[in-house]
């Protein structure tokens, strides 16, 4: 087998996870290579999400997600200083509009405390309106001061640039086709740009992680794509709709349609959450838009839809 290059670690996937892993590994005396199938990094899920640095109150206590969420939130404070990341620590509100939802907030409060989230408190309607005057329908809210919003695209680029400065390599337009194995162990990664020898492989391929795993002989899981749609508002016409992150009270399906202001000053509403077969279908639908608007209006009845960006 002829290898075009060799690496100690090959990271598959150039999103926020893959680039963060690459940066961390690049701190050590290792030859690290990241493979990204697209023309640039961070143009998959990383570029199209709510960009929230969650406080950590929602995940089940004791779960890996709960542990890493709280730890990750703290790490981003350090990363912001180290890499000059674009982050605004706005805090988040989980808004309740019914007595039943107020009870759910109490459950989230207790779970958050068990998870180690600091500063959580239940706010009255009056206290909520002091922070977010447009939330006129709320009865109260759970306040999480440690939450924030970031610019994920910029964060992934910062991770990758730092890793490259440390000696790592990023190869774009590089699709993984298979793996070389010896005695049941992966020793190389086959790509459209040749085969790379590898001692270790990190699968950070996002919604395609199951397909990469199958190429390696692991068929223990599958990923069902779930698409979320958003509506983005013009910041010049809608600059003070909300200050920070506003969630509705969550359901078993999702955290719900939220209202949030990005690090660049635009407000958005969304996303919905619809499972689909395609991993590439990013179409925005009329049904989806209507769903988002109706849900967001439960929190802010007077949404300025004339300020929505449509082109």
Per-range role (PLM):
Residues 3-17, 33:
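Beta1/beta-strand and adjacent pyrophosphate-binding region of the FAD-binding site
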Residues 17, 40, 208:
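Conserved Rossmann-like nucleotide-cofactor binding loop
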Residues 20-26, 53, 84-88, 178, ...:
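Active-site substrate-recognition segment that forms the wall
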Residues 26-47:
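Glycine-rich FAD pyrophosphate-binding loop
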Residues 36, 89, 124-125, 172-174, ...:
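Short loop/edge segments at beta-strand edges and connector loops
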Residues 51-131, 256-257:
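Dinucleotide-binding Rossmann-like beta1-alpha1 core, especially the glycine-rich loop
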Residues 60, 67, 95-104, 143-161, ...:
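Short beta-strand to alpha-helix junction loop
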Residues 142-200:
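Helical element adjacent to the flavin cofactor pocket in flavoenzyme catalytic cores
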């Amino acid at each position: 087998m002829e290898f075009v290059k060799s690496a100690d670690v090959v990271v598959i996937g150039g999103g926020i996870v893959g680039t963060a892993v690459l940066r961390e590994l690049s701190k050590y005396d290792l030859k690290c290579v990241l493979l990204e199938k697209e023309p640039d990094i961070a143009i998959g899920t990383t570029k199209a999400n709510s960009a929230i640095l969650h406080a950590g109150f929602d995940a089940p206590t004791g779960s890996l997600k709960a542990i890493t969420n709280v730890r990750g939130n703290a790490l981003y404070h350090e990363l912001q200083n180290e890499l000059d990341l674009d982050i605004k620590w706005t805090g988040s509100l989980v808004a309740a509009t019914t007595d039943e939802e107020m009870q759910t907030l109490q459950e989230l409060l207790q779970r958050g405390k068990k998870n180690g989230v600091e500063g959580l408190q239940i706010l009255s309607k009056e206290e909520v309106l002091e922070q977010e005057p447009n939330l006129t329908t709320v009865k109260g809210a759970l306040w999480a001061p440690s939450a924030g919003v970031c610019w994920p695209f910029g964060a992934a680029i910062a991770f990758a640039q730092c890793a490259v400065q440390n000696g790592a390599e990023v190869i774009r337009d590089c699709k993984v086709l298979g793996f070389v194995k010896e005695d049941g162990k992966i020793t190389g990664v086959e790509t459209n740009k040749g085969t790379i020898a590898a001692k270790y492989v990190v699968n950070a391929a996002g919604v395609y992680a199951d397909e990469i795993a199958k190429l390696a002989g692991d068929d223990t899981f599958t990923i069902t794509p779930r698409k979320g749609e958003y509506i983005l508002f013009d910041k010049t016409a809608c600059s003070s709709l909300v200050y920070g992150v506003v969630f509705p009270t969550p359901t078993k399906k999702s955290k719900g349609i939220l209202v949030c202001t990005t690090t660049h000053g635009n407000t958005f509403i969304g996303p919905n959450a619809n499972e689909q077969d395609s991993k590439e279908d990013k179409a925005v639908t009329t049904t989806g838009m209507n769903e988002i608007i109706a849900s967001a209006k439960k929190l802010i009845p007077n949404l300025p839809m004339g300020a929505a960006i449509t082109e």
